[in-house]
Regions:
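Phosphate-binding active sites in nucleotide-utilizing proteins
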Residues: 1-2, 6-60, 65-70
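Short, glycine-/Ser/Thr-/acidic-enriched flexible segments
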Residues: 5-7, 32-33, 48-51, 84-85, ...
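Generic recognition of flexible, low-complexity loop/linker segments
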Residues: 30-33, 66-67, 87, 125, ...
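Hydrophobic, well-ordered secondary-structure elements that form the walls
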Residues: 43, 80, 97, 138, ...
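Cysteine-nucleophile active-site neighborhood
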Residues: 50-124
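Amide-donor transfer/coupling interface in amidating biosynthetic enzymes
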Residues: 105-197
């Protein structure tokens, strides 16, 4: 679990659920650590403020390269909002992990702010096709390539597509709470253990 000043937004209840399901959560700092902790079987890159620390994140070439390599190799990874931004090509012109397309930029205002219902368009790490999850977006930054693995709908009826998702990845601006759909936590841990659920 990425935990430092750049990555600090997590629902503690969600982390507690992962622990209750048997996960050992090992913190690391994308700002300070040169490599991932030994033996990790999955990544959780939460929200936060990577844009405020983009220069320092960019300087950590070794960890950025390792994270890109393990994501490409299929290590299960959840990356919400700031964590998603970190996986893209860049934030404000500063090189990031580069595992996903897109360059993040400051819109100067809240973008797609509020609660949404996200519907999985295909089976993925956390959801099966057609499953719906309550989520929310809260960010000033955006990218021209936010992904299209989920359909998002606000209570007002406004719709768009969001997030990248494969059998080993969820990465997008929307945040979720594992207790909204606990099977997502079970699926994430099963993927980390290389089990079928």
């Amino acid at each position: 679990v990425a935990r430092d000043r750049a990555f600090c937004f997590y629902y503690e209840d969600s982390l507690d659920l992962l622990r209750q399901l048997g996960a050992e959560l090992v913190p690391f700092s994308p700002l300070a650590d040169e490599k991932l902790p030994d033996g990790v079987q999955g990544l959780y890159l939460g929200g936060g403020y990577p844009e405020l620390y983009a220069a320092r994140l960019e300087e950590n070439h070794t960890l950025r390269r390792q994270i890109r390599d393990v994501v490409y190799a299929g290590m299960p990874c959840i990356a919400e909002c700031g964590g998603f931004m970190y996986l893209t090509q860049s934030i404000a012109g500063r090189a990031m992990v580069g595992a996903l397309p897109g360059d993040c930029f400051d819109t100067g205002k809240l973008t797609r702010f509020g609660y949404i219902t996200a519907t999985a368009r295909e089976d993925n790490l956390l959801c099966r096709a057609g499953e719906q999850v309550p989520m929310h977006e809260f960010h000033h930054w955006d990218t021209p390539q936010p992904g299209d693995a989920f359909g998002a709908e606000k209570p007002s009826g406004k719709q768009w597509r969001c997030a990248y998702a494969t059998d080993t990845l969820y990465a997008g601006f929307p945040h979720f709470h594992f207790y909204a759909k606990p099977v997502m936590a079970q699926r994430f841990l099963a993927a980390c253990r290389k089990e079928t659920l």
